[in-house]
Structure formats: C-alpha cells, structure tokens
Amino acid sequence: MDEDLDRLSQREREVLRLIARGYAYKEVAKELFISIKTVETHVSSVLRKLQLSNRHQLTRWATDRRLV
C-alpha cells in the first residue's frame, strides 16, 4: 500500500474515494451519515497530509493509484 495512503484514517480514505468519484460534499455527507462540515474537515486533512492543494489534485492522486 502507498505510504501516503497509510497516513490517512479509514474515514479519510472513504471521503477521498467518494470525492475522487465526483461526489459533492453534500452527497458524501449523506452517504457516510456525517455532516457537511465533517466532510470539509476530512477533505482539508487529506489535502494537508498528501500535500495537495485542491479537489482536482486529490482526484488525480486517487486515480493515479487506482483507488477509484
């Protein structure tokens, strides 16, 4: 498994996969039964841990690693 992926919590990985599939924050929240604010927090954490700047880079990162 990718070392960068190991840095993420299980929930962060779930959020990452859904965001990379094109889900909106509201859709991720509904799918995972969490608040939109919690989704935003997880996305910010993932971006920071992976040293990415935006959702586009996040999607590219996940696609390159065949997570979606």
Question: Which residues does each PLM region occupy?
Answer:
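Helix-turn-helix DNA-binding segment
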Residues: 1-38, 65
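Short Gly/charged-rich anion-binding patches and loops
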Residues: 11, 42, 57
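Residues within the helices of the helix-turn-helix
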Residues: 26, 44, 56
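Residues within the DNA-recognition helix of helix-turn-helix
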Residues: 31, 42-45
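Basic, Lys/Arg-enriched C-terminal extension of HTH/homeodomain DNA-binding domains
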Residues: 47-68
